[in-house]
Structure formats: C-alpha cells, structure tokens
Design a protein with these regions (language model features):
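Transmembrane and membrane-interface helices of multi-pass
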Residues: 1-216
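Membrane/wall-proximal cationic-aromatic binding patches
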Residues: 199-253
Length: 253
C-alpha cells in the first residue's frame, strides 16, 4: 500500500507540475515524509480485513481463502484507484482535495465529463485500468501466498499473533495512542496549498470527509437546542420586570 500511495502522489505531482514553478525540488521532496503518518493510517485501515482472513487461514486449511483475498484486494484497488484518479481529474478545476461532493456529481455524469479535458479523461481512464491491473498482478505474484496447511499447529500461536497485530494495526489507524486521533493537519508543512494537498492521503481524506458528512445527516452541526427553546431563552434575556424608562414629558402617550 505504501508503494501504491507513493506512486499515486508522484503521478499527481507530475500532472500538476505546472502549478509548481517557484517551488524548489527539495521542498517538493518534503511531501513524502510528511505524508507518512496518514499513509500508515490508511494502510492499516485497508489491511485490517486481510488480518482477519490470514488468521482464519492459519487456523482453518481451505484453498478458498486466497480467492477471497484476491477478490477483496481487487475491490479495494478499484475503489482507491478511482478516488486517486478522480482527484487528479478534477484538481485543476477545484484546486482542493476530492471530497464527498464528488458523489453528488455522479447523478449527472455529463457535468464530470464537461469539467475534465477530453484528452486528460482518456489518459486517466487508461491510467486507472493500468494502475489497478498492475497492483492486482503485483499482489497475486508477490504478496499472496499459497494456502497454508498448518503443521504442528499451536492453538495459542494464532490468537496471540492476531491480538498483537490487531493492536499494532489499531495504533496505526488512529496515529498512535495519543488522546487525539490523527488528522489531515498532520501532513501540512508548506505555504503552497498544492504541496499540502499532495501530502494528505487522498483515500483517507475522501473517506473521512464522506463519513463526517454522513454523520451530520444534512443537519446544522451548531444547533445545540430546538428553535422554540432558543426563543424562550431570548425572551427571558430581553424581558424587563418593570419599565425603567425615565419619563421626560408629562404626557405618557
């Protein structure tokens, strides 16, 4: 996953190198170390389901585990690559990270097509297909292993390993054991917005933005009480127990 994120970041910077005319090479290189924490968090989130399947694979010998992991990896690659190339496509127009608002445009795909240059759109579609195919092939050839047949299996080994790895993945997800979880600000380091955008993990940002938006449920996040209750409080604040106006005229009308 780290290679996936780094390569995607390189592609993004190359596509929008025209927006970096006055930025030094060394400042651009700072993007990668500042991106590490969010990349680690995202990698842990994406790796969590595989930890479950690998643990089950060690406990139960079944050839179907590898098929499940291949399908799961393909689904993840499709989603994460779509987010990556979607951001590359709209960044020139939006100049901000891809957010949940992109899903609203899916209701009218013509707006998306009109926003992105035709040549760039074709390149992005080809790049998307090649990206997914390359990383799926890499996973199948290098990462995934043949079905494990436990020999001299210890009933204690798998649970302990699972607990240790689960704890490490949990720590990676939230960016450590500090009171405050990791956020986008962890990657900000430059006065150039595009470098900060490049450092923030695209997939982490999109998913966090989408989940945060769904929790709001189109409601006002600053509304702490009902309108009726607020009006009653205002009436009490402005109410006067007696008229304290100084009478200057004899006529009280």
């Amino acid at each position: 996953w780290f290679f996936f994120f780094i390569l995607g970041r390189v592609i993004f910077l190359l596509v929008y190198s025209n927006l970096l005319p006055d930025v030094s090479f060394w400042e651009i290189m700072k993007v990668f170390p500042h991106a590490f924490k969010l990349d680690l968090s995202t990698a842990c989130w994406l790796s969590a389901p595989f930890l479950v399947f690998i643990s089950l694979q060690y406990a139960i010998s079944w050839k179907g585990w590898n098929v499940i992991k291949k399908v799961l990896m393909l689904a993840m690659l499709l989603i994460t690559s779509m987010i990556l190339f979607g951001e590359i496509g709209v960044y020139d127009e939006w100049r901000v990270k891809l957010s949940h608002k992109a899903l609203l445009y899916l209701r009218n795909p013509k707006e998306i097509i009109d926003t992105v240059d035709t040549g760039l759109l074709v390149i992005l579609l080809i790049g998307f297909a090649v990206y997914v195919a390359a990383f799926q092939c890499l996973y199948c050839k290098v990462v995934i292993k043949p079905a494990v047949v436990p020999q001299r299996y210890s009933a204690l080994k798998s649970p302990i390993m699972f607990i240790v790895l689960a704890f490490l993945i949990f720590c990676g997800m939230r960016g450590g054991l500090k009171g405050v979880p990791i956020s986008q600000s962890q990657s900000f380091f430059s006065q150039h917005a595009i470098l900060n955008d490049a450092a923030v993990n695209t997939q982490w940002n999109f998913i966090f933005n989408y989940v945060h938006f769904k929790t709001l449920d189109n409601s006002n996040p600053f509304q702490e009480m009902s309108t009726e209750q607020a009006n009653d409080i205002l009436k009490d604040i402005y109410a006067t127990p007696q008229d304290t106006t100084i009478q200057v005229l004899n006529n009280s009308r």
